[in-house]
Amino acid sequence: MQKTLNKSYICRKLPKGVKIKIDGKLNEPIWKELRSVGPFEFPWAKKGDLRQSTVAKLCWDDDYLYLGYHANDISINAKNRGYKGSVWLDDVVEIFIDPTPKDKKYFGFELNAKGNLLDYSAEYYRKFDNKWSSPNTKTAVNITKGKYFQAEFKISFKDLGVYPKNGSKWRMCLCRCDYNKGRRGEFTLWTPNGKEKPDFHILPAFGWLVFKK
């Protein structure tokens, strides 16, 4: 079992005039300039697992948090489940964010490889409110068959009810479920949490998202 590791990521503010189109392509120059959060961990991996790599980058402006995922995946497994469907049963990338670390509440955004979004608010431990939604958040997915899929999130601060400032620190978990035919599911995340069985919702083990201009 792997120990917890509270990582941190410096989230840079977009330069004035720079825009990001949410199309899942990640082809704006800014995505190349931003550094990644670093390697994702495989705390529950077993011999023979594929351990397909994941890259994530983030930035922000006055109104939104932007997240780009590049997920290597030789075989996409996902269904069209619609909005707020059971996307955790698919190839999916996720972000959990806690803008107010003094409480036990956070927000979840899960996007499967078909572009279906599940958003919710939650209270630790696993008290989910699926009635909550983020109508101003936008997402998109783009698939390169046999190689990878990419996902983009544009998360609305207005919907979260909190606007970060330079130096603000939020808790964050980045994670992924990867399913491949004939194999067991693989679960990877940015900050391991010490649990013996896969579980992404361990709020005290979330990393830190640090907003900088």
PLM-predicted stretches and their roles:
Residues 1-213:
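Structural preference for beta-rich elements and adjacent junctions enriched in aromatics
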